[in-house]
Amino acid sequence: MKYMITSKGDEKSDLLRLNMIAGFGEYDMEYDDVEPEIVISIGGDGTFLSAFHQYEERLDEIAFIGIHTGHLGFYADWRPAEANKLVKLVAKGEYQKVSYPLLKTTVKYGIGKKEATYLALNESTVKSSGGPFVVDVVINDIHFERFRGDGLCMSTPSGTTAYNKSLGGALMHPSIEAMQLTEMASINNRVYRTIGSPLVFPKHHVVSLQPVNDKDFQISVDHLSILHRDVQEIRYEVSAKKIHFARFKSFPFWRRVHDSFIED
């Protein structure tokens, strides 16, 4: 079996990575960072997100594993003390694949520029590049509202525990193939109105954000943020692709939520 291990880059994570590579050397395991079947991330959720985007073109062939060397993460649920046990389990291939939905973001530009497509594990946000943020929100080709405010956030089910939560969005179980739209400081008065609530969209629904005046936007996809100019439309939908995790033990999603936000 081919595997690779990525590290946060701190001393603790780097040392653990080297120890695990040495451990895998005792088994029929091949280190391959080009076409791995198992990707192990050591660090936190940020390190895991980087590993995900590094291999997002090969998601069907990869199972991911996360080891946290800091606080418990939603994607990094193994502890450093369990590394030797994990090496043995991976080498024996004793795991099940668990899949989570992803978010597809398509940015369309003016004439002459090719559209750009992105994949998110957590969320995508849209903000103005400087002026007022005003967009028309269109759901399945039907105009829903004209939004004015700081911005909008579309998240995956697993991503609802991240930025979405701080915006007052609901937490969604990753078994639900859906996406959630939350507002950032919307303007609501006698003249301007928005729905003022998070919106959850099922698979096959398409949400389109269409500029009203300014066509330059700061668009983020997970930890990547880029200024896009001459934007004509931003489309969100549940991706046909999924991320696969190698699961060796039961760690229910709601237990993860409890340990992260209530008590560990």
UniProtKB/Swiss-Prot annotation:
Active site: residue positions: D45 (proton acceptor)
Localization terms from the record: Cytoplasm
Molecular function GO terms recorded: ATP binding; metal ion binding; NAD binding; NAD+ kinase activity
Taxonomically, the superkingdom here is Bacteria
Assigned EC number: 2.7.1.23
Sorted alphabetically, which keywords does the UniProt record give?
ATP-binding, Cytoplasm, Kinase, NAD, NADP, Nucleotide-binding, Transferase
State where it is primarily located.
Answer: cytoplasm
Its required cofactor(s), as named, are: a divalent metal cation
Q: Where does NAD(+) bind?
A: D45, G46, N122, E123, R148, D150, T161, A162, Y163, N164, K165, S166, A185
The protein's annotated catalytic reaction(s) are: NAD(+) + ATP = ADP + NADP(+) + H(+)
Give a Pfam family name: NAD_kinase_C
Cellular component per GO?
cytoplasm
**Which HAMAP family does UniProt cross-reference here?**
NAD_kinase
The record ties this protein, via PANTHER family, to:
NAD KINASE
Q: What does this protein do?
A: Involved in the regulation of the intracellular balance of NAD and NADP, and is a key enzyme in the biosynthesis of NADP. Catalyzes specifically the phosphorylation on 2'-hydroxyl of the adenosine moiety of NAD to yield NADP.
**Protein name (Swiss-Prot/TrEMBL):** NAD kinase 1
What organism is recorded for this protein?
Listeria monocytogenes serotype 4b (strain F2365)
